[in-house]
Structure formats: C-alpha cells, structure tokens
Swiss-Prot record:
PTM comment text: Disulfide bond is required for functionality.
Compartment(s) where it occurs, according to its Swiss-Prot or TrEMBL record: Host cell inner membrane
Protein's membrane topology: Single-pass type II membrane protein
Side of membrane Periplasmic, spans: 50-218
InterPro entries per UniProt: Phage_T4_GpT_holin (IPR020982)
Species this chain originates from: Enterobacteria phage K3
Chief location: host cell
One Pfam family recorded for the sequence: Phage_holin_T
Family as reported in the entry's similarity comment: Belongs to the T4likevirus holin family.
Transmembrane domains' residue ranges: 35-49
SUBUNIT field: Homomultimer. Heterotetramer composed of 2 holin and 2 antiholin. The holin-antiholin complex binds dsDNA. Interacts (via C-terminus) with antiholin (via C-terminus); this interaction blocks the holin homomultimerization and delays host cell lysis. Interacts (via N-terminus) with the lysis inhibition accessory protein rIII; this interaction stabilizes the holin-antiholin complex thereby resulting in a robust block of the hole formation.
Cytoplasmic face residues: 1-34
Protein's recorded name: Holin
Gene that encodes it: T
Length: 218
C-alpha cells in the first residue's frame, strides 16, 4: 500500500518557519537577528516568485541607461562636427553671420535650435534665446528644403528665433541636411548685412559639402 502523499502550501511553510523562529519568545539581539532572517527570506521569496519580472526590469533599465549615454555622445559629436563645418562655411562664404539649425524632437521637427553660429548676431536675436523656436512648416524655406533644394532670399528668414523684422539682413542662403534616417533634420544658413556676396553656384558647393558631413554625423 502506497504511503499517503503529503503536500505543503507556501503558507504552511511560512508559518512553520515563523513558529520555529519565535516560539521561545526570544528578545533583544536574538529577536532582531530572527526578524532579519524573516525579512531576508521574504525578499528571497519575492525574487524567486517574480524573478523573470525583476530580470526584465533590470535589462530594460540597463538598456535605457546605455541608450541615453549613446545619445549624449552622439549629440556631443554632432555639435562638434557642426561647429567645425560652420567655421569652414563661414570663412569660405564670406558671410557676416552663419548658423547651424537643428530640429527637435527627432524626425518630428516641432522646434528649431541654433546649435552653433559664427559672426555677429542680428540685432533682433539674443544669445540667451537661441533655442526652442517653433517651426512653421508652411514657410517657403521649409518646403523647399524638404525636397532637398537650397533656398535663398533677401526678405524671408524662416528660422531666425525672432518675430521682429531684421532689416539689417540683405541676403541669406541656406541648404538642408538630412539625418541617417533620411529625414530633414536642420539647415546650414548664411546671412549678409551688406549687399554683395559670392555667387550662388559657389555657395551651393560650400553648403552642400558641409550638409553631407553633418548628415552623416546626425
């Protein structure tokens, strides 16, 4: 005849352990050590019961931290490349003011920031407010850039972070750059306060080269 099978539920085991630990009414350090054992057992039980969830949460948090680090490094590298290319553009174009604009959030383009500039800021722009300007996607410059074409004007300056007229600007020339997702990500723009500037063919060559390099870094 087979022996009867005895089963224990988790609650039976728990109360059995508690009974063993506290049945002698111990006090002081002995009691404290036993309470510590109970807490440890409780934590081990939670880890055992929900181990997969804890491990998944740990992996997710590590991945998010790693992604944030990579994103910060990429942004820092892009800003360095942007400044380097802008210096070349500014000198080669003989512009009075040049800027690299970057859109955010990534691939959505709701706001625009000046992330680097060379030359003298227009009188209507403050160095303290170079970022967070809303993007008007109906403007000619934006729609022209979406098609990969360069833009120039002597009266419309879509991305300058100001609503005030800027009469000292007589001419501007800009070209778009596209990120690694092939999404319009920002512009390189040159401005002149005087009437004379080098030919658009030359500006196209200067701007296109910088835009390709920025696109690979973005």
């Amino acid at each position: 005849m087979a022996a009867p099978r005895i089963s224990f539920s988790p609650s039976d085991i728990l109360f059995g352990v508690l009974d063993r630990l506290f049945k002698d009414n111990a006090t002081g350090k002995v009691l404290a050590s036993r309470v510590a054992v109970v807490i440890l057992l409780f934590m081990m039980a939670i880890v055992w019961y929900r181990g997969d969830s804890f491990f998944e949460y740990y992996k997710q948090s590590k991945y998010e931290t790693y992604s944030e680090i990579i994103e910060k490094e990429r942004n820092a590298r892009f800003e360095s490349v942007a400044l380097e290319q802008l210096q070349i553009v500014h000198i080669s174009s003989e512009a009075d003011f040049s800027a690299v604009y970057s859109f955010r959030p990534k691939n959505l383009n709701y706001f625009v920031d000046i992330i680097a500039y060379e030359g003298k800021l227009p009188s209507t722009i403050s160095e303290k407010s170079l970022g967070g300007y809303p993007v008007d996607k109906t403007m000619d410059e934006y729609t022209v850039h979406l098609n990969g074409r360069h833009y120039y004007s002597n009266s419309k300056f879509a991305f300058l972070p100001t609503k005030k007229p800027t009469p000292e600007i007589n001419y501007m020339y800009s070209c778009p750059y596209f990120n690694l997702d092939n999404i319009y990500a920002g512009t390189i723009t040159m401005y002149w306060y005087r009437n004379d500037h080098i030919s658009n063919d030359r500006l196209e060559s200067i701007c296109s080269q910088a835009a390709r390099i920025l696109g690979r870094a973005k």
